[in-house]
Amino acid sequence: MKKILLVFGTRPEAVKMCPLVQELRARREIKTVVCVTGQHREMLDQILATFSVVPDYDLSVMKDSQTLFDVTTGVLEGIKGVLEAEKPDIVLVQGDTTTAFAAALAAYYLRIPVGHVEAGLRTRDIYSPYPEEFNRQAVSIVSRYNFAPTEQAKENLLAEGRDPGTIHVTGNTVIDALKTTVRADYTHPELAWAAGKRLILITAHRRENLGEPMRHMFRAIRRVLDEHDDVRAIYPIHRNPAVRETAAEVFGGDERIHIIEPLDVLDFHNFLARSYLVLTDSGGIQEEAPSLGKPVLVMRDTTERPEGVAAGTLRLVGTREETIYESFTELLDNAAAYEKMSHTANPYGDGRACRRIADILAGE
């Protein structure tokens, strides 16, 4: 029986790995072991509960005001004992987090094969996003299995000289997650507050946007909200104190926006399904929103998901106040522009990525 250890520690990782945990645990020929690092503690626990995933190991590395040094050393030191005790045949990591980087590095040190879920995303700038672009490139170097979500991701890996035999195009596992979480009968008091209005969903927390860039982003959003009485915004805010301070400074007193605590994945996906459009500097939502027909304004200068830009469902607007203001206003005031972005083919898969990954791992 093949033993597979899945390691993850943040909310985005959990959303994309929990459906894979469920798929692998349904396979008799695979023993599935789950280790969470707790890089994002409370938000991680929400996802685990939603998917009824109980981890076998919890490293609990999160601490107040943690740095990249803290997370990297905490995961490296904690995962070593798990790897030595379990002796897995394969270690699976997801995406581009510090957890993924450190766990893959630890597996490499012990000569354990690494599988990388969502491999091949690239901006080619290791400081944008930071540190995610470096993390995912580093994981690819040590991976024996590269599960690329799209053909473009595969081409990125081939361009770097990766062995074609290690690359498998599977689609993105977040689409699998949406099949579980989005529900027709869902209700929530915040959605009732926005009933009859066009709902804008905001997510913003990116490390490189902290400070003045985020202030510009928020000012643009507030200007648009002040000019459109039929629009309401909901911002499930990140726990980073720097994000909260800037949001309070810019949005304070504006009755058209509700700043709420982070949502669990079931709530978030259902808010997303009922939104009019999304403004974000996040990565994963660039995949989730197109699957639900929602236009996305990406408040970043680069994206590792060019498929959405090419398909027309994502638009890069950077962090300049005027650019965000103009694009946001256009989608609210120009019905043709909105329709063009909201009716595009989803480039990120068909909801069967987990099955494909499990088939590959079981067949090796």
Show where each model-derived region lies:
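Nucleotide-activated sugar donor-binding and catalytic core shared by glycosyltransferases
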Residues: M1-Y235, A242-E364
